[in-house]
Every structure is written in structure tokens, then in C-alpha cells.
A protein has these predicted regions:
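Active-site-proximal C-terminal subdomain of hydrolase catalytic domains
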Residues: 46, 140-230
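Boundary/activation segment at the start of structured domains
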Residues: 4, 18-100, 107, 114-116, ...
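Alpha-helical, heptad-rich or low-complexity scaffold/stalk segments
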Residues: 144, 263, 270-273, 278-318
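Bacterial N-terminal signal peptides
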Residues: 5-17
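Second-shell loop/turn segments in exported
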Residues: 31-39, 68-76, 89, 113-119, ...
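Caspase-like cysteine protease fold
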Residues: 191-278
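Extracytoplasmic/secreted proteins, especially bacterial periplasmic and envelope-associated proteins
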Residues: 36-47, 51, 77, 81-88, ...
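Active-site microenvironments of hydrolase-like enzyme catalytic domains
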Residues: 86-120, 135-176
């Protein structure tokens, strides 16, 4: 294992720009539920769009925003509009794309079916699962509403990052999670590993800690516990808990490192290969303890060796 540790250190030392891909951000603001919430959601939408454009350098044409019924301009957050957009996204997305979806507003659970409240007919967790199925590329969906846990159970898929504001469908009160999730997106301190980039996992962890502190400072029982799932088992875990989830979310960055303007097709292919290897390494970690140690170590070392070789080749070609 000494060789493996040496290789891992080498990989981090050889960090190089990642492949530029289309990064989509889809902000879905559903039915507001009243003037008080409408004002709050307008602030959240505005802050989200601003931080995505300014801090994370998303291109304006790839930031889609659906608004609540109180908004005077913009596409309404109706089931019809949302379905139409995602149908088009399925056609235009590619396997190298990253699609970040965040749901703002309110959710309900009637004891059987969980829904996200929209302007007009609501959409169930299954509706959302069916709608985003088939999107090419990496997908991260954050449901910030009350009663959101069933969305994690439904949307779970290996490699797909799903975050819900609650760990139970029974939590029926408006959540504070979106406030702290957006705040975490804006703060440099969220970059916990200090690598100059901010991952979905880091935002989730920072927001979760802030929610806990929110309730403690008010002397209240914590009624919402956010969960993250990215291994496809539909269970998820809290940021402060141990568990298999989080590997993919740790390398799902909101910001994108720039590819050199003179990048050749060969360099682009190498960068794609490195991203694939990084994901395979995270997935392989989930097999620790499941397969024989000797076999696990051999496969992991093989992945790390190739990752180091590819990273070295990328650095070499980037310096030309």
C-alpha cells in the first residue's frame, strides 16, 4: 500500500485543468405559498443566479430559471414549462456536461406520494425521476423543501448526486436549508480542502452545519437533517455521519477550471480519461470491505497508477 499512497500524492501534485464542458444550472422556484415566501424566494433566486454567474462562471445562456406565481417576468414554474425544458435538455446535453438542478419552494407528502409544489399541477418524486432520466452527463439535484426525503429514494442512481433538506417525509414545516445552502455557495470558507474549488459535497457539509447551528442558537430541536446520496442505494447520509455516500459529490465541482485555448483533441481526450478514472476510483472505494482486500488493493493501485500517468501526460502537454 506504500506504493498506492505515493501514487495518490503524485496525483494531487500533478493537478491540471479539467475539461471544459457545458455546465447547466436549473433553478426551479415553484408555488410560493404567500407574499412572505414569494419575497424570500425572489431573494434566493436572485442570489443563486448571481453566485452561479459571478463566482462559478456559469454562462448566462446555460442558467435557466423558473419563477413563482408572484413574479412579474420570467418563465413560470409550471409542470408544462419544466417538462418542456428538460425534454429539450435531453436532446442537447452531452456526456461531458454537468447539470445542477435546485428546487426552491414547498413540498408535500400525503402519506403515500411526495410532491414538489409548482404553479398549477404539482409534480411527484416519480415525475421528476422520469423527467430527468436520460439526461446525458453528470446530474446533481438539490430539493430544498420540506417533506423532500422521498425524492432521494426515488431519484437515487449510481453516480447521480441527490440532496434533500430532510431525512423524513413527515417533516412538514418550511425549511431553512435553502438559505444556508445558498449562503455556503457564496462563501470562500466553504472550500474545506483548500484546493481552490468548491464541490457539491463541501456546500452540503457547510449548509448542514449551519442549519444545526441555526436551531441550537434558538434553543430549538433540529427538525431538519439534510441527506446526500450518490451511490444509488437510496439511503443517503448526513454530512456528520459515516457512510458510503459522498465520493462522487466530492469531485462534483460547481466551478470549472479553464482548458488552455490551444488544447489539442489529444489533450482533451486525456482530460476526459482522467475524469473517468477519478469517478471510477470513487466508485471503487465503495467496494472496500465487500471484495477481498488483496483484490481491492490491486485494482485500486492499478487505477491510481493510470491516474498518475494520465495526469503526468496532461501536465506535459499543457506546458508545451
Amino acid at each position: 500500500m506504500k506504493n498506492v499512497l505515493l501514487v495518490i500524492a503524485t496525483v494531487f501534485a500533478l493537478a491540471t485543468p479539467a475539461l471544459a464542458q457545458t455546465r447547466w444550472a436549473v433553478i426551479v422556484s415553484g408555488a410560493s405559498g404567500g407574499e412572505k415566501y414569494a419575497e424570500q424566494m425572489n431573494t434566493w433566486r436572485t442570489d443563486l443566479r448571481t453566485v452561479l454567474l459571478n463566482r462559478y462562471q456559469f454562462k448566462p445562456e446555460f442558467v435557466k430559471m423558473f419563477v413563482d406565481e408572484a413574479a412579474t417576468s420570467g418563465d413560470k414554474g409550471s409542470a408544462e414549462n419544466v417538462r418542456k425544458f428538460f425534454a429539450e435538455l435531453k436532446k442537447s446535453s452531452s456526456k461531458d456536461d454537468f447539470v445542477f438542478i435546485i428546487l426552491l419552494g414547498h413540498g408535500t407528502f400525503d402519506g403515500d406520494v411526495a410532491k414538489f409544489n409548482l404553479v398549477g399541477p404539482d409534480m411527484t418524486a416519480k415525475d421528476w425521476t422520469d423527467m430527468i432520466s436520460g439526461i446525458q452527463g453528470r446530474v446533481a439535484l438539490v430539493n430544498t423543501t420540506e417533506a423532500s426525503f422521498p425524492f432521494l429514494e426515488s431519484l437515487t442512481s449510481k453516480g447521480r448526486v441527490v440532496i434533500t433538506a430532510t431525512d423524513s417525509a413527515a417533516q412538514k414545516y418550511a425549511t431553512v436549508f435553502p438559505e444556508y445552502f445558498i449562503k455556503a455557495m457564496k462563501e470562500a470558507s466553504t472550500d474545506l480542502d483548500k484546493n481552490g474549488r468548491t464541490s457539491i459535497y463541501e456546500i452540503f457539509a457547510a449548509a448542514s452545519a449551519a442549519v444545526k447551528q441555526h436551531y441550537e442558537q434558538r434553543g430549538q430541536l433540529t427538525t431538519e437533517r439534510a441527506l446526500l446520496d450518490d451511490n444509488g442505494d437510496g439511503k443517503g447520509r448526513e454530512a456528520s455521519a459515516e457512510g458510503p455516500d459522498g465520493g462522487i459529490a466530492r469531485i462534483a465541482y460547481l466551478d470549472s477550471e479553464a482548458v488552455p485555448a490551444n488544447a489539442t483533441p489529444e489533450l482533451a481526450a486525456l482530460i476526459r480519461r482522467r475524469q473517468t478514472l477519478e469517478q471510477q476510483a470513487e466508485e471503487h472505494k465503495q467496494l472496500k470491505g465487500v471484495m477481498p482486500d488483496a483484490e481491492w488493493n490491486a485494482q485500486f493501485e492499478k487505477l491510481m497508477l493510470e491516474l498518475a500517468q494520465v495526469s503526468a501526460e496532461i501536465r506535459k502537454k499543457s506546458e508545451k
